[in-house]
Amino acid sequence: MASLSRPSLPSCLCSFLLLLLLQVSSSYAGQFRVIGPRHPIRALVGDEVELPCRISPGKNATGMEVGWYRPPFSRVVHLYRNGKDQDGDQAPEYRGRTELLKDAIGEGKVTLRIRNVRFSDEGGFTCFFRDHSYQEEAAMELKVEDPFYWVSPGVLVLLAVLPVLLLQITVGLIFLCLQYRLRGKLRAEIENLHRTFDPHFLRVPCWKITLFVIVPVLGPLVALIICYNWLHRRLAGQFLEELRNPF
């Protein structure tokens, strides 16, 4: 009976290493990385914007918890849990404005759509995926721009003046041409009838020509300037209102 062999040290060591390897591999089996856009996403005030997010390696995320929040106070922008959108957990300023696009959630890809973009939406967003106790996240940035950011007063005046100048030159040339033809025609008729012709008869005062050309020009220009100022005041008022009442 003394000849019964005990487990050798190498075999015990191999079993221990195999068990350790299985535990490590099982612990890493559920891990993944969350990937978001590397560059800032740009949107215009009042438009829609989409914030994409995915996990790598790709896997079915239907049973995971997926969401977006805004640092630093972790305001919930959108939350997906237990296969449903949890609208009750949203921050008040995002209720009714977000939609989670889940067409590719089986591949671990989702997109958050935000409607009616506001100035207050500018800044950082964080997307996260949670699988049981394991969670990973990725940060992204949204840039909100004024739809009329390129319209400076100088550009507006230039856009208004160029067509006006062309219109003024065209109207002036047409007016002079008609006046010349009319004077020539009347002169010929008067000479044929042997009547006295007064060269000042068809001469139009300069102030009348100026009034005839300038008045139609100033009207559209003034209207454009008023429209520009109204739009900027409206956008500025919306921005200040969002700052006063963020929720």
Swiss-Prot record:
Domain Ig-like V-type intervals: 32-145
Positions on the Cytoplasmic side per record topology: 176-210
PROSITE patterns: IG_LIKE (PS50835)
GO BP terms in the entry: cell adhesion; central nervous system development; regulation of cytokine production; T cell receptor signaling pathway
Residues with glycosylation annotation: N60
Annotated disulfide bonds: C53-C127
CDD domains with a match to the protein in the record: IgV_MOG_like
Residue numbers on the Extracellular membrane side: 30-154, 232-247
SUPFAM superfamilies xref list: Immunoglobulin
Signal peptide: 1-29
InterPro entries tied to this protein: Ig-like_dom, Ig-like_dom_sf, Ig-like_fold, Ig_sub, Ig_V-set, IgSF_BTN/MOG, Myelin-oligodendrocyte_glycop
Domain of life: Eukaryota
Bilayer-spanning residue ranges: 155-175, 211-231
Tissue: Found exclusively in the CNS, where it is localized on the surface of myelin and oligodendrocyte cytoplasmic membranes.
GO molecular function: signaling receptor binding; virus receptor activity
Alphabetized UniProt keyword annotations: Cell adhesion, Cell membrane, Disease variant, Disulfide bond, Glycoprotein, Host cell receptor for virus entry, Host-virus interaction, Immunoglobulin domain, Membrane, Receptor, Signal, Transmembrane, Transmembrane helix
A GO CC term attached to the entry: plasma membrane
Annotated disease: Narcolepsy 7: Neurological disabling sleep disorder, characterized by excessive daytime sleepiness, sleep fragmentation, symptoms of abnormal rapid-eye-movement (REM) sleep, cataplexy, hypnagogic hallucinations, and sleep paralysis. Cataplexy is a sudden loss of muscle tone triggered by emotions, which is the most valuable clinical feature used to diagnose narcolepsy. Human narcolepsy is primarily a sporadically occurring disorder but familial clustering has been observed.
Protein family according to the UniProt entry: Belongs to the immunoglobulin superfamily. BTN/MOG family.
Description of how the protein assembles with itself and partners: Homodimer. May form heterodimers between the different isoforms.
Record function comment: Mediates homophilic cell-cell adhesion. Minor component of the myelin sheath. May be involved in completion and/or maintenance of the myelin sheath and in cell-cell communication. (Microbial infection) Acts as a receptor for rubella virus.
Protein known as: Myelin-oligodendrocyte glycoprotein
Protein's organism: Homo sapiens (Human)
Lineage: Eukaryota, Metazoa, Chordata, Craniata, Vertebrata
